[in-house]
């Protein structure tokens, strides 16, 4: 029998159930459930598409208790109402001829409090996971441990009633069952902890109740599997002999298979790194005759027949397949037919492959996505040597190109290279090669280096394309032509480009900076919109009229009423526009000046800017929209009173003319142009700015030269919470999450949720001219941005208010009195001191306690060029300049005398898509 035949032959489990082959789809979290853990139709179709040729599908982990979900969008089996939805998954899989097994789990101390309504996670002991930002769990009482076992039993019963052929007990990945067995997380002194036998009681009890439910509600064919992580890195922690001890006990009680949870089938020890022996070989050598009767399953890195064959040869009986089943729904049929597969996903095929939007954005899936739109791109094959600069070093990059793809990227030897440097280079190299485009996300912690490498690849591609054109007899000096030219690659520019492309226009994006993202990438709070479906799901009652009135009030009634009305009316559609393109802003908070939770942000509560730009860039790449970086627009060319083209200059000092019928200027404001700021606001001389260095007002000057009018140029906003050493903006969502502001004496001094101008003025009026944002662990847990501030060293933390006050040099008694007074206001939902009416969410009483020193900085310029409600640029006589459109901070009039936090992101998407629509409409006739 050949190896291929071995893989595809039926396999009988110890309980007599026959699997049609040895191949299983591994359980992989998709984050595609509804907010309440119920099943979506998209998830049903995802599993239906992957059933059939593969013998068995293990459905992603289901939480058995509403304290147990470890992921946003997780699906649950914690109540009987979930049975109907799960039954749809089971039926979809079984109808195609595959077995359906459901994995059940509880996250324990790995649960983020924000996923369970801000409640404290539970665990065997009150010991936080050894990772940055981990929440402190509450230890389960003895009675609660018994109750938790019963909940696992109820989960098994529901899985049976939903029609599943079996369950897999998730005893791996540091979740609750593993936590009970680990001496790191279980330091109890009762019958559930202490000795290895006591620590094994919980996983064995879960197996026992699973058998009990199977006997009561299922037949003998019901499959019971157990997944385990063979080792832990922590000290103390689970070692391989501990694992073998537990597995022997599980086998003695009866289990139909055991499932290694490792990243690669032949992974060696992560504890004894000097020993290269694969753990599966150790397992086979150490197991008893009883354990040898239990089939063992391997997972990790299986793409082709040879990979599965290697696993069988080393001792696995069954092979679970992960990413390959995502990339190829019919994976088993393909390898049965002898296909050799490459692990990539065509960026245009998400819908065809039935990959849910949340799963599409997972890093492991994103790494497989390849931009197939470059099929039309043609290069002159060869190696191009590019010299670029990151923040600290000059880098020499060798870029090898073939006719239609990027073949390789090499970093020339340099004495400045470190292990960290070369590691991050390899990561960005892999992203670019996999995506076949330089427009990929930078590596976290290595942004400057990543952008330099991306720039080198982009320059090489441009040179190669020009060389090929010259070789084929093309005239490189001849003007290029696009329907729409977008100037600026922040959120407004990218949104305009995507919209114009989707309406049939050919589009060029021109960006003067070396990187995509503009100032949007620094946005933190979120995106305001009223009457959205995400508000309705959360039961938030809101109205567009209230949004309009609060924005008008916040802008001191200086807003252009027509533009503001268009802004408010189009905001919900803008949220949906993003969602339709895979950018989900479905977590909701509030910002200063708003009385309702309407600030939409990413599901995990992280800063909106990077998430938004990453999603928009994926859409740009997917569509094959041309982008020129390090290129400035020197002049907008006119033919009579109409736009006819642009004159560009790149970083090689080449002058390029591009013909176009429509131009969208989305270059941002002028906060980084200190001379321009001081011209209109002399009182702001010396203030730092939160903006990136490209925010110089160049687009305003460009449009003024063709006759554009301007408005509100003296309306410049300072943001109250800026870290002064780095000019880093501290998100308004921290205050919106329940933080307070205190002065150096430890006292509150103003309503933290007032508009930015008023809060800034109050801080400036303090003798010290700075303040502290103070918050506790509850606020930190619900705001992912806070973890970033901690990592950057902005945060002073302490275990108690007294310790925090001492570290900040403030009077402890005054600080404690401040906290007591504020916590009383939260309890009464009434702030007698300063009239705060919003974001009185929870008392500040959960340690550790945190503080960030802040002061105001120049943040937003409300003034800019004049436009009408169609995004057309108006001249000094308020007449449209034909073919000229503008969006984002380059525009004046929308925000009046003060911009509300969360309105800028709404502005760029609303007016960016509007400008893109109108520009394409004009260009296409």
UniProtKB/Swiss-Prot annotation:
Modified residues annotated as FMN phosphoryl threonine in this record: 447
Assigned EC number: 1.3.1.6
Domain notes: Consists of three domains. The first domain of FRD (Oxidored_FMN, PF00724) carries a non-covalently bound FMN and is used for NADH oxidation. The second, FMN_bind domain (PF04205) contains a covalently bound FMN, that acts as an electron carrier between the two other domains of FRD. The C-terminal FAD_binding_2 domain contains a non-covalently bound FAD and forms a site for fumarate reduction.
Cofactors required: FAD; FMN
Signal peptide bounds: none
Reactions the enzyme catalyzes: succinate + NAD(+) = fumarate + NADH + H(+)
Binding site for FAD: 492, 511, 519-520, 525-526, 633, 860, 889, 904-905
Record protein name field: NADH:fumarate oxidoreductase
Binding site residues for fumarate: 525, 731-732, 859, 899, 902
Catalytic machinery residues: 756
Entries under Pfam families matching the protein: FAD_binding_2, FMN_bind, Oxidored_FMN
Family: Belongs to the FAD-dependent oxidoreductase 2 family. FRD/SDH subfamily.
Domain of life: Bacteria
Protein's organism: Klebsiella pneumoniae (strain 342)
Keyword Cell inner membrane (UniProt): no
Post-translational modifications: Is flavinylated on Thr-447 by ApbE2, encoded in a neighboring gene. Flavinylation is essential for catalytic activity.
Biological role stated in the UniProt entry: Catalyzes the anaerobic reduction of fumarate to succinate. Uses NADH as the inherent electron donor in this process. Is involved in anaerobic fumarate respiration in K.pneumoniae.
GO cellular component, one term: cytoplasm
Chain positions recorded as succinate binding sites: 525, 719, 731-732, 859, 899, 902
Quaternary structure, from the entry: Monomer.
Subcellular location: Cytoplasm
GO MF: FMN binding; fumarate reductase (NADH) activity
Keywords on record: Cytoplasm, FAD, Flavoprotein, FMN, Oxidoreductase, Phosphoprotein
UniProt xrefs under CDD domains: OYE_like_4_FMN
UniProt xrefs under InterPro entries: Aldolase_TIM, FAD-dep_OxRdtase_2_FAD-bd, FAD-oxidoreductase_2, FAD/NAD-bd_sf, Flavocytochrome_c, FMN-bd, OxRdtase_FMN_N, Succ_DH/fumarate_Rdtase_cat_sf
pH dependence remark: Optimum pH is 6.0-6.5.
